């Protein structure tokens, strides 16, 4: 029975963070489109560096911390509301705020196919990592597993964006994703033990790219 529950949890986690799950993440690049336009990301090597830096030290790291905290406090509505408010405040640009809130809303809407009381404990609108953290926690999925798959989903989407932007091909894109495995597992392990005191980023160029994307005339992505 324990094995069945673990398999069920794995299936749910895979479904929720699959590219096929209807959250619309394909529409966002998180500033990567601007970075490509500005010549900051030009090939597979620089794409891998960009993604790895954001996971370890940028906005994606903050998302991982928020996910872990929401996972930890999924049974406490007051704490979830506080974490959700903090997640909104940490959005560094209008597009970044729009992205995390719309993804969170779409995730919660789709995840209601698996009924649980956590949906009543969360705010009506919650940032994406807060939504994912609370729902995975409520369904008994371990924080490190949830974080690893969440980070891998981000990396996979970023690689897909890089391919669509023409900085790498599919074969090199797969190699980028494979090369990020060690980074993802290390950050997932670190984030699982994190607290809100560990929030913080040091990716100024990425933050500026996110802001500059708001005035970009020609674009494929919404962020």
From Swiss-Prot:
Stored Pfam families: UreF
Subcellular location: Cytoplasm
GO CC terms, sorted: cytoplasm
Superkingdom, taxonomy of origin: Bacteria
Signal sequence, renumbered to the chain: none
GO molecular function, one term: nickel cation binding
Main location: cytoplasm
UniProt keyword terms in alphabetical order: Chaperone, Cytoplasm, Nickel insertion
Similarity annotation: Belongs to the UreF family.
Subunit structure, interactors included: UreD, UreF and UreG form a complex that acts as a GTP-hydrolysis-dependent molecular chaperone, activating the urease apoprotein by helping to assemble the nickel containing metallocenter of UreC. The UreE protein probably delivers the nickel.
HAMAP family: UreF
Biological role stated in the UniProt entry: Required for maturation of urease via the functional incorporation of the urease nickel metallocenter.
Protein name: Urease accessory protein UreF
